């Protein structure tokens, strides 16, 4: 962009261009002007094309989602009970994004979901399941059935830091019919081990060469200190974009909590399970409750990243940034299943909100996450151009194989349920159990209300297939969008927007109709293959 885009021009043509007092279109500051255009949504704006001098596969989508954590794909799934549980969180993290596990469930259920994410891709497993010689084959089968893995080290104490004696894998017991046999009869004793302090890359190389399923890590005395899994090595090869911590190589895990006293207890359990990012889940984040919660978290868990929100104005953002937020969620009433703007008459059009909050937060190095109203790749591109570091999606990811719930058929279409956390259905979830665990009511400050006021609806969405096809489609589409704009990464996108080299246009209703399919008797809109 900028001067580089004039490299192919003759001096005469360049001079003629420079005779114009202004470039085509608007700069972003001029476009997002409430006095001129009112509040704008994503459909109200379009980005003008730039100059291409690079291949699309060279476009990097790396971006901060908090002050410390960087993703290779700036996609997040919303903490909704029909969008994100452990399956979504694991698979989105493998593809370079991150899923935020909802909290419309018991503390135990949410903690177990976090634990599943952290255990999925372990790097060095520092708290492996360990058995002793006194355990039996049935114990290994039970662990396999309950936790989904085998390859269990055997020590003299049956605990970590005991003397390593052997290992029992699924192959050792595959054709062994006596479940009462002691493990000493079936375990493998000829082991390949790594020494304590070995680098992960070196340990992975040993696994490659020895062709074993597990690599026990032992100290000088032969005591077990950690374990490395071959299955994790394969995951590293198959998912190079995976969102992982650089030291442990575990998948990054995020989960939502509220701001009630009980949520402090909930958060302690989540942190013990390995939580990396907490999302404070509220439709209106500018409250004394959230400010106090941020301060408490920063005191109790200084290494935990805090995403606060939701906010739509600079003034709201200022309070949460001052309290110590590491990132902000932006959006109020813009989601497809949200009726806050209609019912409460409070909120803000999403494009204007993302721009206003992102522009202010960037002065303090605080990333923003555009949450709500994302319907397609174009909306993702616009949100990032408006200043967001990532997008949070509910509707766009609901209906995938990895989202919670069962498929059902209606009129020949395969569907999944999708509901807003402000819907009556979500608010009544767990009503027969502990009402204190209902996140939907607390999110809208309504847990003490005798009459529930809905700020969302329940509905259904069409089957979108697996994330492993759908997310690469979104990712590749975003790369093509950035190529059309003429930037190779998101840092350059924000820089060129700030320097007013990337230009925008306001779209009238007629221009929006023109920019969509029109003039056909019928058509089929197939978006990917």
Curated annotation (Swiss-Prot):
<keyword id="KW-0332">GMP biosynthesis</keyword>
<dbReference type="GO" id="GO:0003938">
    <property type="term" value="F:IMP dehydrogenase activity"/>
</dbReference>
<keyword id="KW-0630">Potassium</keyword>
<feature type="binding site">
    <location>
        <position position="514"/>
    </location>
    <ligand>
        <name>K(+)</name>
    </ligand>
</feature>
<dbReference type="InterPro" id="IPR013785">
    <property type="entry name" value="Aldolase_TIM"/>
</dbReference>
<feature type="binding site">
    <location>
        <begin position="281"/>
        <end position="283"/>
    </location>
    <ligand>
        <name>NAD(+)</name>
    </ligand>
</feature>
<feature type="binding site">
    <location>
        <begin position="331"/>
        <end position="333"/>
    </location>
    <ligand>
        <name>NAD(+)</name>
    </ligand>
</feature>
<dbReference type="GO" id="GO:0000166">
    <property type="term" value="F:nucleotide binding"/>
</dbReference>
<keyword id="KW-0129">CBS domain</keyword>
<dbReference type="Pfam" id="PF00571">
    <property type="entry name" value="CBS"/>
</dbReference>
<protein>
    <recommendedName>
        <fullName>Inosine-5'-monophosphate dehydrogenase</fullName>
        <ecNumber>1.1.1.205</ecNumber>
    </recommendedName>
</protein>
<dbReference type="InterPro" id="IPR015875">
    <property type="entry name" value="IMP_DH/GMP_Rdtase_CS"/>
</dbReference>
<keyword id="KW-0520">NAD</keyword>
<feature type="binding site">
    <location>
        <begin position="371"/>
        <end position="373"/>
    </location>
    <ligand>
        <name>IMP</name>
    </ligand>
</feature>
<dbReference type="InterPro" id="IPR001093">
    <property type="entry name" value="IMP_DH_GMPRt"/>
</dbReference>
<feature type="domain" description="CBS 2">
    <location>
        <begin position="187"/>
        <end position="243"/>
    </location>
</feature>
<dbReference type="GO" id="GO:0006177">
    <property type="term" value="P:GMP biosynthetic process"/>
</dbReference>
<feature type="binding site">
    <location>
        <begin position="418"/>
        <end position="422"/>
    </location>
    <ligand>
        <name>IMP</name>
    </ligand>
</feature>
<comment type="similarity">
    <text>Belongs to the IMPDH/GMPR family.</text>
</comment>
<comment type="subunit">
    <text>Homotetramer.</text>
</comment>
<dbReference type="Pfam" id="PF00478">
    <property type="entry name" value="IMPDH"/>
</dbReference>
<feature type="active site" description="Proton acceptor">
    <location>
        <position position="443"/>
    </location>
</feature>
<dbReference type="InterPro" id="IPR000644">
    <property type="entry name" value="CBS_dom"/>
</dbReference>
<dbReference type="GO" id="GO:0046872">
    <property type="term" value="F:metal ion binding"/>
</dbReference>
<comment type="function">
    <text>Catalyzes the conversion of inosine 5'-phosphate (IMP) to xanthosine 5'-phosphate (XMP), the first committed and rate-limiting step in the de novo synthesis of guanine nucleotides, and therefore plays an important role in the regulation of cell growth.</text>
</comment>
<keyword id="KW-0560">Oxidoreductase</keyword>
<keyword id="KW-0479">Metal-binding</keyword>
<dbReference type="InterPro" id="IPR005990">
    <property type="entry name" value="IMP_DH"/>
</dbReference>
<feature type="domain" description="CBS 1">
    <location>
        <begin position="124"/>
        <end position="185"/>
    </location>
</feature>
<keyword id="KW-0677">Repeat</keyword>
<feature type="binding site">
    <location>
        <position position="515"/>
    </location>
    <ligand>
        <name>K(+)</name>
    </ligand>
</feature>
<keyword id="KW-0963">Cytoplasm</keyword>
<feature type="binding site">
    <location>
        <position position="455"/>
    </location>
    <ligand>
        <name>IMP</name>
    </ligand>
</feature>
<feature type="binding site">
    <location>
        <begin position="394"/>
        <end position="395"/>
    </location>
    <ligand>
        <name>IMP</name>
    </ligand>
</feature>
<dbReference type="GO" id="GO:0005737">
    <property type="term" value="C:cytoplasm"/>
</dbReference>
<dbReference type="GO" id="GO:0006183">
    <property type="term" value="P:GTP biosynthetic process"/>
</dbReference>
<dbReference type="InterPro" id="IPR046342">
    <property type="entry name" value="CBS_dom_sf"/>
</dbReference>
<feature type="binding site" description="in other chain">
    <location>
        <position position="335"/>
    </location>
    <ligand>
        <name>K(+)</name>
    </ligand>
</feature>
<feature type="binding site" description="in other chain">
    <location>
        <position position="338"/>
    </location>
    <ligand>
        <name>K(+)</name>
    </ligand>
</feature>
<feature type="binding site" description="in other chain">
    <location>
        <position position="333"/>
    </location>
    <ligand>
        <name>K(+)</name>
    </ligand>
</feature>
<keyword id="KW-0658">Purine biosynthesis</keyword>
<feature type="binding site">
    <location>
        <position position="336"/>
    </location>
    <ligand>
        <name>IMP</name>
    </ligand>
</feature>
